[in-house]
């Protein structure tokens, strides 16, 4: 029984923490880096993106594994809880295909931008800022997926 409690804790903290971190990047970090010159902002965005790419997909997968265990272990006691954990797993995993389907174009555009060009050309600077704002808006959807995953996990933990 104690293993279930441990997995419930991890199953709540992982998606909720990820949701908060993703939302923080969009609402606090992006505006802060956009204060400076565009070439510096681009370098900072690339660093932030590379760090997120190394962690958030794996957190989503780890969350899905934890939720999958909970869904499996709770199926005999409470089918509703089991379904909530399954919903939580799928919701958390949605950040990966969402990124690949809806954000990849913006990511590729930002990664291939020439820092020297965005410093010299006003139109290139405006284009950079437009792309990064669009990326930030889409990033909030990723936060929402993880938040919903956390809520489903909380509901599954409370329901039984």
From Swiss-Prot:
Its main location: mitochondrion. GO terms for cellular component: mitochondrial membrane; mitochondrion. The chain crosses the membrane at residues 13-35, 55-72, 83-103, 140-160. It comes from the Eukaryota. It is found in: Mitochondrion membrane. It is a multi-pass membrane protein. Pfam families: Anthrone_oxy. Keywords: Membrane, Mitochondrion, Transmembrane, Transmembrane helix. This is Uncharacterized mitochondrial membrane protein C800.14c.
